[in-house]
């Protein structure tokens, strides 16, 4: 059974620097993904069995404390925090490599539309000038065919990335990556961070720092897009509280 109490969750942003090198699957969890996982066994398995799970929500941090969970994260680690850390790490490595006459490091963005990916490539050239950027936009459909999956995997292998971002929105991105993990012959960290694609491309604005620092980024998004977000944040947060009460009262 999927339970927050028993999940292993990273404790702080500082711990990102302790992650081992090599093939590593990094997922995020928030109140919405927790609620979704309770109804989706494959998504629950993907979150439970990935290599690293980061608390992308103040609600997760507070809930872990309240229910006495095994993991006690000390702060929220947003998907953007993971992205920022990993991209800067790879930029430094790539700068050192190119200074020695070696090939630049490659970051790959798999997911989203070609329009968004083109914007990502343009901005990455400005912010991370020493990185080589590759992209792949999969077809927009609820389920991929075997041919679609082979094409995605082939594109990833052709890129041979030193860092791979998967952005197809949750839970699709987590389930796809987990289901095809053994088929991916890669050597790098892989992060499932769909919303960050839009943040970095500039098609969606993050909340101002005040909202972020006070754990209110969810409220900012609700106020900006009430018709799209009310179900996720009003109904979803209420359901999350109910689920946490159930966990707290259970043995």
Per-region residue spans from a language model:
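A transmembrane-helix-recognition feature enriched in membrane-embedded lipid enzymes
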Residues: 61-62, 206-251
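Conserved beta-alpha
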Residues: 67-95, 101-155, 159-160
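Short Gly/Thr/Asp-enriched flexible loops that form oxyanion-binding sites at enzyme active sites
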Residues: 121, 174-183
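Proline-aspartate-enriched helix->loop->beta-strand connector
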Residues: 156-165, 169-170
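N-terminal nucleotide/polyanion-binding subdomain common to many enzyme families
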Residues: 1-84
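Short glycine-rich anion-binding loops that position phosphate/pyrophosphate groups of nucleotides
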Residues: 31-34, 168-173, 196
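A short helix->loop->beta-strand "cap" motif at the edges of active sites that frequently abuts
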Residues: 23, 104, 185-189
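Short, flexible loop segments at boundaries between secondary-structure elements
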Residues: 138-143, 186-223
